[in-house]
């Protein structure tokens, strides 16, 4: 079954840009897309899976270990490297779904019962966290996820490692992934501890523009009638965007942040009253990725402005005297701050 092309998605520019930024800068902390039902959140994530470039991994490794990252190899790859046998291959960057009904064993991994019964061997069967290593872990309706799984994800996200202690097994393996969550806020709030772990938070709304709504329906109908033909129509656009991603990934280490931009980012977070320093760090990482996507090697005010709402809206304290949306508060603070900076120059 063909996947809907990423470049065929109409509108939702903030969500699409956030996913591209998280692809270029995986250490950002992932993307949370909250909004109305039927607005393309799940479609965008699955379309991203087909768009992503390949990566180099240890051949045959169940965790897609990076052969160049010696300190982050799984136990099997460390043993193979010590024996001098560490061949590599190109594989697709994984995008793994974590369903709401998943058990803890399915998420973290468990004893391979088939091998245990057949051969009497205690072998580990990797879970979803292992499959998502160096890729993306997607959770739809993340605000409905069970609390014990939320705690588990927080632990793994903080350490970058999955520790399994059960049924006589004691094992740890790398588990670094970009977390993408989606949901409808009407169905429940997200726990603050998990909310703060997301690098970017985007608001996804039902389109109100008539022409845009018509184009969404037209494209979806065309895709369902002829998936192969519709996919071919956007093949060139998909290839061009994939090349842009690869170029941005290579450019990212060369992107610098001037002192003036660093000061602006810090002032913006102070003005908005964000807790801790995670806001500034995320803001700068996102701005660097935005610059890399644009082909620039220096972060500017425009890059900062482009990513600030998504990087900061979920870090604001609720103000009972200001009922405006968090994104609007960020926009107001930016407008005031950048106008002051312009006057100072």
UniProtKB/Swiss-Prot annotation:
* Protein's pathway: Porphyrin-containing compound metabolism; bacteriochlorophyll biosynthesis
Q: Give the first-level EC class, as a single word.
A: ligase
Q: Key word Hydrolase present in the record?
A: no
Catalysed reaction equations from the record: protoporphyrin IX + Mg(2+) + ATP + H2O = Mg-protoporphyrin IX + ADP + phosphate + 3 H(+)
GO biological process assignments: bacteriochlorophyll biosynthetic process; photosynthesis
Q: Which GO terms describe its molecular function?
A: ATP binding; ATP hydrolysis activity; magnesium chelatase activity
Looking at the record's lineage, which domain of life comes first?
A: Bacteria
Q: Which UniProt keywords apply?
A: ATP-binding, Bacteriochlorophyll biosynthesis, Chlorophyll biosynthesis, Ligase, Nucleotide-binding, Photosynthesis
PANTHER family in the cross-refs: MAGNESIUM-CHELATASE SUBUNIT CHLI, MAGNESIUM-CHELATASE SUBUNIT CHLI-2, CHLOROPLASTIC
Other remarks on this protein? Substitution of the magnesium ion by a zinc ion in this bacteria has been shown to occur after this step of bacteriochlorophyll biosynthesis.
NCBIfam families attached to this UniProt entry: BchI-ChlI
What does this protein do, in the record's words?
A: Involved in bacteriochlorophyll biosynthesis; introduces a magnesium ion into protoporphyrin IX to yield Mg-protoporphyrin IX.
Q: Which family does it belong to?
A: Belongs to the Mg-chelatase subunits D/I family.
Please state what the protein is called. Magnesium-chelatase 38 kDa subunit
